Amino acid sequence: MALSLDGLPEKPAPAEAPSPPVGRRVQASLVFARGGRTTVLSRQVVPYPFHITRAFRMHPESPDLATLYLQSASGGLYAADHLTLAIAARAGARAHVTTQAGTVVHRGGPEPSRQETRLTIAADAFLALNPDPLILFPGAHLAVSTEITAEPGARAIVTESVACHDPVGEGRPFDRLDLGLTIRDPEGRALVRERSRIDGRAFTAPDSPMGPHRAYGTMVVLGAPDDARLAGLHLRQAADAAGCLTGVSPLPNGAGLGLRLLAPDGGTLSAGMDAVFRIVFETLSGCAPGRRRK
């Protein structure tokens, strides 16, 4: 007897796996070199959403020091973005890379938005990288990684800062923040390796390990003539006077000096970071930093 399947419900098709989030995968590259008794941008690869200005000469007493503004043409970091910035300072080059405004990190998903920075600094080169804060919007999921390779005699100032902000004023937290720092010698040996992670609810909770502070910044100083003397140049007092809570300590393996700042908000943090940056910049470069145009 034949068996009929007419009238039986069809077997449901297997559910399709959700597509992984797709963000932008972009790498920008800048190379500063010594040429004609000054510092020139000898190579640049700057795809969207990165954008740079021309190199400015903002230090009459040090005309060889180039200042360059890095900008975002897309309005910030979005879900699952993976943006990488590589900067090299060749021997004798002196460069200051900064921004004109903070970078917004928008709501993310399971896969974080990633920002990687890779710095290579040759002997007798000076590189200062001090962007404005990353601003974490509600639901932002961000992973930041900074890797520095420095030759003996290299000088560098590298800052990083984050603040949180809810545009509608409801105090909604970001999702999660991962921070990583690695400093290597030219042979690839890791001198410093730091990792930290905090979720937004813990960051903003009444019992937060940050206390009442809602903004956090770090500064790495490499190649100072005397770290102990630099630490004594009232760095803590300068940042504290701006409203920050500041710590200064030597980095492992004699790599340099590290600073950490806490502040109630991004504006206060920026003021404290700028106060410290001015002191360190003048110590390492021999001139006061030019006033940044905003």
Curated annotation (Swiss-Prot):
One of its GO terms (molecular function) is nickel cation binding. Residues 1-22 are annotated as: Disordered. InterPro entries: UreD. Its main location: cytoplasm. Pfam families: UreD. Residues 11-21 have a biased composition (Pro residues). Keywords: Chaperone, Cytoplasm, Nickel insertion. It is found in: Cytoplasm. UreD, UreF and UreG form a complex that acts as a GTP-hydrolysis-dependent molecular chaperone, activating the urease apoprotein by helping to assemble the nickel containing metallocenter of UreC. The UreE protein probably delivers the nickel. Required for maturation of urease via the functional incorporation of the urease nickel metallocenter. PANTHER family: UREASE ACCESSORY PROTEIN D (PTHR33643:SF1). This is Urease accessory protein UreD 1.
